[in-house]
């Protein structure tokens, strides 16, 4: 057996039955794996299958779902095996580095991706015309590739022992070995993760401030129409005089309201943001912020434990706190589908369409034509 903690241990051929704590860990992690794999698979299939979801926000959501699903399928089985073998690593040192690399890769990928999503949410509300014109499929692909490239750049150096990947017995996983900061190589990685999370929430704070400033509407000021020959033109005109003139009831010259009836081609081509689109963008913003907030809440205890190891040398992290923090970070891989189906009406509608038996009363029956008498 290869144990990368530096303390070789031997595992007997017959496995001892797991303790109550290990049994709880196995059950919880197994449940997290099932929910993550099923939820992310369903959400990914919906985004791929339904044309109504072929939009930039859902492409980013698809990338997050695929990353969480791969993390659950690749990394979590090794954690289950280590718990089953009494918090021991029974595989090679190379496999430990590979699993640790993938775990850190998916963590940083989620952080980078959530930051990019927060920027696109701000652009969708504050600069919608630019967003609608520039946020194409290829732009989304470029953003996703950039997030993966930055994640690889953050997770790859420890493979060459720049910040060491080792099996941490207290965490039952292969991950960064966080030591005291005077002999530590991982402080920079933790600072980068903290800066990313802070920057993401700063962008959402700016978006909230923008919406608050633009939610106040000016009161309607009634401007009287101007008329010298009963044509009634000007800012307060309703166009009724022009309609009367067209119908043959007008007298005198053509009303000024008809002189500018031909619109400017550039102004006509400018796309305005309707109320339905505003509500849709705000709904997507709330959903992605809920995902970001849960990412922060579920990873914060583990990040606090990492900083504790780096800056506090005299006192070790309590074992129960560390175990809870690690399993909370595992649970983050399963929460995204739940949040999306709870907060997104479009995803609920698509789910009912493709799985009518899950909806209330099945698929809606086609309406018969009728006439109002």
Swiss-Prot record:
CDD domains xrefs: 7tmA_SREB3_GPR173
Topology of this chain in the membrane: Multi-pass membrane protein
Residues that carry a glycan: 3, 184
Signal peptide: none
Pfam families: 7tm_1
PANTHER family assigned to the protein according to its UniProt record, in alphabetical order: G PROTEIN-COUPLED RECEPTOR, G-PROTEIN COUPLED RECEPTOR 173-RELATED
Protein family according to the UniProt entry: Belongs to the G-protein coupled receptor 1 family.
Protein name: Probable G-protein coupled receptor 173
UniProt source species: Bos taurus (Bovine)
């Amino acid at each position: 057996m290869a144990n990368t903690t530096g303390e070789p241990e031997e595992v007997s051929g017959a496995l001892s039955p797991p303790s109550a704590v290990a049994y709880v860990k196995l059950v919880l992690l197994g449940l997290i794996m099932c929910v993550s794999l099923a939820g992310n698979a369903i959400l990914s299939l919906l985004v791929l299958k339904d044309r109504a979801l072929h939009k930039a926000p859902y492409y980013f959501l698809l990338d997050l779902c695929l990353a969480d699903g791969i993390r659950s399928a690749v990394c979590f089985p090794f954690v289950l095996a280590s718990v089953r073998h009494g918090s021991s690593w029974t595989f090679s040192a190379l496999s430990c580095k590979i699993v640790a690399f993938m775990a850190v890769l998916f963590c940083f990928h989620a952080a980078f991706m959530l930051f990019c999503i927060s920027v696109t949410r701000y652009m969708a509300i504050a600069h919608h015309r630019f967003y609608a014109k520039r946020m194409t499929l290829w732009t989304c692909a470029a953003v996703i590739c950039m997030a993966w490239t930055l994640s690889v750049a953050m997770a790859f150096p420890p493979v060459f022992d720049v910040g060491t990947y080792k099996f941490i017995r207290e965490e039952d996983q292969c991950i960064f070995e966080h030591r005291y900061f005077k002999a530590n190589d991982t402080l920079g990685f933790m600072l980068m993760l903290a800066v990313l999370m802070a920057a993401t929430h700063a962008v959402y704070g700016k978006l909230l401030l923008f919406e608050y400033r633009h939610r106040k509407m000016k009161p309607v000021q009634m401007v009287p129409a101007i008329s010298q020959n009963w044509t009634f033109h000007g800012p307060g005109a309703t166009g009724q005089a022009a309609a009367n003139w067209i119908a043959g009831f007008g007298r005198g010259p053509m009303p000024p309201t008809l002189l500018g009836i031909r619109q400017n081609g550039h102004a006509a081509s400018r796309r305005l943001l309707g109320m339905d689109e505003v509500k849709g963008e705000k709904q997507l913003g709330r959903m992605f912020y809920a995902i970001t907030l849960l990412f922060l809440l579920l990873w914060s205890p583990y990040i606090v434990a990492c900083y504790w190891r780096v800056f506090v040398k005299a006192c070790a992290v309590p074992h129960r706190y560390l175990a809870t923090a690690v399993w909370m970070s595992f649970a983050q891989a399963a929460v995204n589908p739940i949040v999306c189906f709870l907060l997104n009406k479009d995803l609920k509608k698509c789910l009912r369409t493709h799985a009518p038996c899950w909806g209330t009363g099945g698929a809606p029956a086609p309406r018969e034509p009728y006439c109002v008498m």
